[in-house]
Amino acid sequence: MIDLSPLVRRLAGTPLACWSQGLQAQLQAKLEKGHGDLERWRGALDALPALLPSEIDLVDGLRLDCDCDDGTRAQMRQALMGLSPWRKGPFDLFGVHVDTEWRSDWKWSRVAPHLDLQGKRVLDVGCGNGYYQWRMLGAGADMVIGVDPNWLFFCQFQAVQRYLPDLPAWHLPFALEELPANLEGFDTVFSMGVFYHRRSPIEHLLALKDCLVKGGELVLETLVVEGDEQQVLVPEDRYAQMRNVWYLPSVPALERWLRRAGFSDVRCVDVSVTSVEEQRSTEWMRYQSLGDFLDPNDHSKTIEGLPAPRRATLLARK
């Protein structure tokens, strides 16, 4: 049983107080529906050793440590491996280095210098396993709620949270569509790596805006293409072997969409081509990764002949 009463207490007196009252029942209904692998993943969580971190670093990475013996480390490693594949990270947990598919710390180092999260109430949409939530706390956020309907990511978050139970981070296994309309309760809303999976991009921007307080900030990170404000790529079928990629706008086009959705102070703070060093297969994620999805003779193109992944981060104000 995951007790959300600390979250309810945290949200008392905020615009999110009313919403928080129904979260425990909403979570319980989701858990009862469950997932075929949930029991196995819960078994991995139960196998984690009971440890109290004496060192916690959420600023320069995500590292927890304490004095523990090799047997305990082996137990930790085996339990964490039971929650594979690990996509976002890396995590250093009591001497076990979880070398995830993505070097999410690289993305964070590109995005974080442009943000002021001090004292902010934050929503991370499509939060994955919560890696960025912990980094947001490290950057001074007052509290962070992540939503992502993927059950494995939910369990991976629980694995870290059991060693940081008093920190104000919560992962709810919900889709953005399961949040009420017009929440208007978050100072900062993140949508990183979600936008291109949405069939209706403007609707997504409007839904994100609805979650923000007036004057709140959106952090939008997504795949883009080069070009002017009329340039948008809609893949015929797959993009880098992904079926569920719909719209890859140019940065000027995306800036226009944000303004059209009612945002102001729109600006692009980073554009980076994703390298095979930043996204790759590892011991902790053994499936195919970016290197398998690019043209083997020309890494500037995907295997389908489309422009290789290029990601931009934009900030905008409600």
Swiss-Prot record:
What's the superkingdom here?
Bacteria
Q: Which CDD domains match?
A: AdoMet_MTases
> Where is the signal peptide, in residue numbers?
none
Example GO biological process = tRNA wobble uridine modification
Keywords, A to Z, come to: Transferase, tRNA processing
Q: Entry's Pfam families? A: Methyltransf_9 (PF08003)
What is this enzyme's catalytic activity, as reactions? carboxy-S-adenosyl-L-methionine + 5-hydroxyuridine(34) in tRNA = 5-carboxymethoxyuridine(34) in tRNA + S-adenosyl-L-homocysteine + H(+)
Q: Where does carboxy-S-adenosyl-L-methionine bind?
A: K88, W102, K107, G126, L176, E177, M192, Y196, R311
Enumerate the GO terms in the molecular function aspect.
Answer: methyltransferase activity; transferase activity, transferring alkyl or aryl (other than methyl) groups
Q: What is its EC number?
A: 2.5.1.-
The function of this protein is: Catalyzes carboxymethyl transfer from carboxy-S-adenosyl-L-methionine (Cx-SAM) to 5-hydroxyuridine (ho5U) to form 5-carboxymethoxyuridine (cmo5U) at position 34 in tRNAs.
Q: How does it assemble?
A: Homotetramer.
NCBIfam families given in the database record = PRK15068.1, tRNA 5-methoxyuridine(34)/uridine 5-oxyacetic acid(34) synthase CmoB
Q: Which PANTHER family match?
A: METHYLTRANSFERASE (PTHR43464), TRNA U34 CARBOXYMETHYLTRANSFERASE (PTHR43464:SF95)
- State the family it belongs to: Belongs to the class I-like SAM-binding methyltransferase superfamily. CmoB family.
Q: What is this protein called?
A: tRNA U34 carboxymethyltransferase
Primary gene name: cmoB
